[in-house]
């Protein structure tokens, strides 16, 4: 598993957007990745310094469409905190604001 395969996508919610002001970024990551591997991947991909990594395993949820039931697959979420002297991660690019 390469470092570029670990981070799948950023999680964009109201809470995660508010945490970006405190240099905390939320990503969906590979479920087999551990904290040290996530730290190495974020530092390599975004060229920043990571202070800490918190991980959460989100359980699968059951969903219904009419009479049919199915499951929405679970995933692993990582909240990455950057150091104070590190630069910000530009998720949306420069033209977003």
UniProtKB/Swiss-Prot annotation:
Entry-linked InterPro entries? Nucleotide-bd_a/b_plait_sf, Ribosomal_uL23-like, Ribosomal_uL23/eL15/eS24_sf, Ribosomal_uL23_CS
Q: Which GO terms describe its cellular component?
A: ribonucleoprotein complex; ribosome
Quaternary structure per UniProt? Part of the 50S ribosomal subunit. Contacts protein L29, and trigger factor when it is bound to the ribosome.
What name does the UniProt record give this protein? Large ribosomal subunit protein uL23
Would you indicate the residue range of the signal peptide?
none
Q: Where are its TM segments located?
A: none
Short name of one Pfam family: Ribosomal_L23
Keywords of the record, alphabetical order, are: Ribonucleoprotein, Ribosomal protein, RNA-binding, rRNA-binding
- UniProt keyword Lipid biosynthesis, yes or no: no
Q: Name one GO biological process term.
A: translation
Q: Cite the GO molecular-function annotations of the record.
A: rRNA binding; structural constituent of ribosome
Sorted alphabetically, which PROSITE patterns does this protein's record hold? RIBOSOMAL_L23
Organism this protein belongs to: Lactococcus lactis subsp. cremoris (strain SK11)
Q: Does the keyword Glycoprotein apply?
A: no
């Amino acid at each position: 598993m390469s470092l570029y395969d670990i981070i799948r996508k950023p999680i964009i919610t109201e809470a995660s957007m508010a945490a970006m002001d405190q240099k905390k970024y939320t990503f969906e990551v590979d479920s087999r990745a551990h904290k040290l591997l996530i730290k190495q991947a974020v530092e390599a991909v975004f060229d920043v310094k990571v202070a800490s990594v918190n991980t959460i395993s989100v359980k699968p949820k059951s969903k219904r469409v009419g009479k049919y039931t199915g499951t929405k697959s679970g995933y692993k979420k990582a909240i990455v905190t950057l150091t104070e002297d590190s630069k910000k991660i530009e998720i949306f690019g420069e033209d977003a604001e």
